């Protein structure tokens, strides 16, 4: 625990320092940090060593903060040792804000045809592909629920970076949709992790046998969010991946499409292994020797599933994941299309 906290403190400080260093180089080259002024000034400085150095520092700084491969070292330990109430915040907010900041910085300041953006697309594309495959494959190795979710997040952040690397309307739409949808999906899964610890002290997926009988809402939340993470319709996760695939096809980036399909299959494998234990394990969690003692000492025992204060967030997450999927066309046409076409791609 203390080691993980110190690692996060150290890497977080490095990430923030790299961002500030990049901002310093940018100011040295342009004399301003106003984004509107920067967008005009950098046109004449494309290829400048200070601008290139600034962009490199920004990629590292944002990459550390959003746990983008290979700058993700702090994230698995943070999720493994953090308090259950903090995990949804880490997954839902802390790694999404720098992703949005990266979008604003690169696409609102630099033009798509510039040397800086060519470098950005190449670097972030490699990081995205490696991160998606690394996170998905590492998640297969673990039976600890939080470890699975932590490494899954590394892959999911890769989807956001892939949208940036695609760089067209569909790619950025997929990236923004995934920022929002993953915030709900992964928060919901970490809510279920906290609920399992609170109710039964469960950490391992091998301890989930027939838990759905005692915790139906928790199990439903886990199922909806996991299916959305895999990318099954009509949930939110399907549509963000759909737009990423459309953008990659439009650009002729078929490697990205192959990686999307492969990672979705890997996600299906590790989540269906969880479902197998949750719904199909013949021996119930109460009968298993490794969990019986924990359950007898449970804070809630065998009464109601959870206090209502803990149930409401999970119900909100279920509704959000479904509604974001059902109404995604309205979100894209009425909100994202004007913002992206008149802002990032103007």
Give names to the regions the model predicted.
Residues 1-242, 246-272, 276-277, 282:
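Hydrophobic transmembrane alpha-helices and their helix-loop junctions in integral membrane proteins
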Residues 82, 205, 215-218, 273-346:
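Cytoplasmic/organellar membrane-interface segments at the starts of transmembrane helices
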């Amino acid at each position: 625990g203390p080691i993980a906290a110190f690692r996060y403190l150290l890497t977080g400080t490095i990430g923030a320092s790299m961002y500030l260093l990049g901002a310093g180089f940018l100011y040295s080259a342009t004399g301003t940090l106003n984004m509107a002024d920067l967008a005009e000034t950098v046109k004449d400085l494309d290829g400048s060593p200070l601008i290139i150095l600034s962009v490199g520092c920004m990629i590292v700084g944002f990459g550390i903060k959003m746990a983008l491969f290979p700058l993700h070292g702090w994230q698995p330990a943070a999720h493994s040792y953090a308090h259950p109430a903090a995990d949804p915040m880490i997954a839902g907010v802390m790694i999404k804000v720098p992703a949005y900041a990266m979008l604003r910085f690169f696409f609102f300041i630099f033009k798509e045809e510039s040397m800086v953006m060519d470098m950005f697309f190449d670097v972030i594309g490699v990081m995205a592909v490696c991160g998606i495959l690394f996170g998905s494959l590492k998640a297969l190795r673990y039976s600890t629920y939080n470890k699975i979710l932590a490494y899954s997040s590394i892959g999911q952040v890769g989807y956001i970076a892939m949208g940036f690397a695609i760089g067209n309307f569909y790619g950025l739409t997929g990236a923004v949709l995934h920022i929002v949808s993953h915030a709900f999906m992964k928060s919901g899964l970490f809510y279920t992790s906290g609920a399992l610890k609170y109710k039964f002290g469960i950490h391992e997926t091998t301890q989930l046998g027939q838990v759905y009988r005692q915790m139906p809402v928790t199990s439903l939340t886990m199922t909806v969010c996991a299916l959305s993470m895999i990318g099954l319709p009509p949930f939110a996760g399907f549509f963000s991946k759909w737009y990423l695939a459309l953008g990659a096809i439009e650009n002729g980036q078929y490697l990205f499409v192959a990686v999307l399909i492969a990672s979705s299959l890997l996600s299906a494998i590790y989540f269906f292994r969880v479902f197998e234990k949750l719904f199909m394990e013949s021996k119930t969690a109460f009968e298993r020797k490794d969990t019986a003692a924990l359950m007898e000492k449970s804070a809630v025992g065998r009464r109601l599933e959870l206090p209502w204060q803990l149930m409401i967030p999970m119900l909100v997450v279920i509704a959000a994941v479904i509604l974001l999927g059902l109404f995604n066309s309205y979100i894209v046409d009425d909100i994202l299309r004007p913002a992206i076409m008149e802002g990032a791609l103007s």
